[in-house]
């Protein structure tokens, strides 16, 4: 099953605690807590292109599974990582954050862990 599609954030748990722990300023945390971001994913084999729109902020990135890439962190920094894929699951480690993204039908769950704090996002395919 391919990740390709457009997904809207449906729910998230522990947003504020996680964002503060990774260094996002309080005013940005406050602005971001109610935004229903849209993620557009295009998958071509091991190649991914992702556009995330959260309010007025747009983040673009691309990566090839198993190869080093640069991704933008929550604080706006760029960091190198290697994204791994196992079936319908993508895993990456970026600046101490473990990210596990899993596709199940029309639902994408993204679980992020940092220093024992877990942030979970659930998005549903809208096209």
Swiss-Prot record:
**Gene Ontology terms: cellular component:** cytosol; nucleus
Q: Name one GO biological process term.
A: fatty acid transport
Q: Where in the cell is it found?
A: Cytoplasm
Any Pfam family from its record, for instance, is Lipocalin_7
Which InterPro entries does this UniProt record tie to the protein? Answer: Calycin, Fatty_acid-bd, ILBP
Q: Keyword Lyase on this protein? A: no
Source domain of life = Eukaryota
Per UniProt, the keywords (alphabetical) are: Cytoplasm, Lipid-binding, Transport
Q: Does the keyword Transport apply?
A: yes
Write out the coiled-coil annotation as residue ranges.
none
Tissues with expression: In adults, weakly expressed in the intestine.
A single Gene Ontology molecular function, please? fatty acid binding
The job of this chain, per UniProt, is described as: Binds free fatty acids and their coenzyme A derivatives, bilirubin, and some other small molecules in the cytoplasm. May be involved in intracellular lipid transport.
Fill in the domain comment: Forms a beta-barrel structure that accommodates hydrophobic ligands in its interior.
Its family?
Belongs to the calycin superfamily. Fatty-acid binding protein (FABP) family.
State the name under which the record lists this protein: Fatty acid binding protein 1-A, liver
Q: Which gene encodes it?
A: fabp1a
